[in-house]
Amino acid sequence: MKTLAWVLLLLCTAATPLRAAELELDSSLNETVLMIPKQGLFTIKLETTLYKPEGAGPFPVVIINHGKAYGDPRFQDRYRPLSGVRYFLQRGYAVVVPMRQGFSKSEGSYIGGGCNIESNGEVQAGDVKAVLDYVTAQPWADREQMLMVGQSHGGWTTLAFGTLNYPGVKALVNFAGGLRQDQCTAWERGLAIAAGSYAKATRVPSLWFYGDNDSFFNTSTYQGMHAAYTGAGGQARLVAFGKFGSDSHSLFGARAGEKIWQGELTTFLKSVGLPGEAQSALAKYGKVSGMAVPEKTEFAALKDDSRIPFVRDTGRAGYKLYLNKPIPRAFAIAPNGAWGYADGDPDPLKRSLDACNRNGKAQCKLYSVDDFVVWKED
């Protein structure tokens, strides 16, 4: 029996689900992680990542709110939207990225609110408010110069937060915001109705980014939300940028998306009296090093895991996990069936190869980067 177990172990090891190890804090971005208390009937702590420019401040503050991946929120990684982080650090902002209750290492349980999408956003916004209450008590925070940003479910959270009209928060930025609820009848209409309700109570302007090949929200869905929001008196400028890659939902996290959103955001920030231009003295925060991204190939469609060479069922399952990770990301494979992936900066390409090569005998090559396939047959 021991021999059989050892043989099985060897067979499994050749295709180990090799995810890159959890990242160390990036000292070049002054990255730290705090556990911020949220008071209530029971006090819970919210895992929050902080990035600050060097110096004592006070700095303008931006909160960046995360989305919701499929599956158990507790297994969701700590959100590190480094493209956005670098953009704001170069402009002198302190960047605060909270994980809401039930997500990652935050305590408490995720409260979905069933099919009541309006209530869902309000509950999420309550967690963000608790973090901002803590932040505004810190000497490094400029309480008069604050911005709320969010992507996907975080964008919806941002719109809900707008109803609080929190002192010092000058504007809202919504990247592909919403919450897809296929189990709920007419959930798209529910989003529009809730957006209109939020607008009635919100006094600050907002900037919205949506694309036409979004895997969560189609064109009619986001147009309906925007029409309801502005029709109810909300101030919302929509940037409808068309198609982006294989899924426009990934715009905010993709380096290729920066040229679409950064110029629009800079103009918007200046229009509401917030810092918008990068400072030359802070240029170091914008530098990204790492492997060059290979060119896209036509070997296979991104989501067609049946075409991936070498890997067994565990590798195909790992690839499905990889596809749910935020951009930037990379997936690597080897002829012996080994595989590995990594997401987030720094350099997910190198880290995915390193993860794969733990069992890949230095023969690993990249199969996919971000939202395209780069594999070439020999």
Residue spans of the language-model regions?
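Alpha/beta-hydrolase active-site loop
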Residues: 116-139
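Short beta-strand element of the alpha/beta-hydrolase
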Residues: 58-67
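N-terminal cap/lid segment of alpha/beta-hydrolase-fold proteins
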Residues: 21-56
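The feature captures the conserved acid-bearing segment of alpha/beta-hydrolase catalytic domains
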Residues: 171, 177-237
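C-terminal catalytic histidine-bearing segment of alpha/beta-hydrolase fold enzymes
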Residues: 232-290
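Secreted/extracellular ectodomain signature
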Residues: 103, 279-378
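Cap/lid segment of the alpha/beta-hydrolase catalytic domain
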Residues: 69-81, 87, 97-123
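Alpha/beta-hydrolase fold nucleophile elbow
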Residues: 140-151
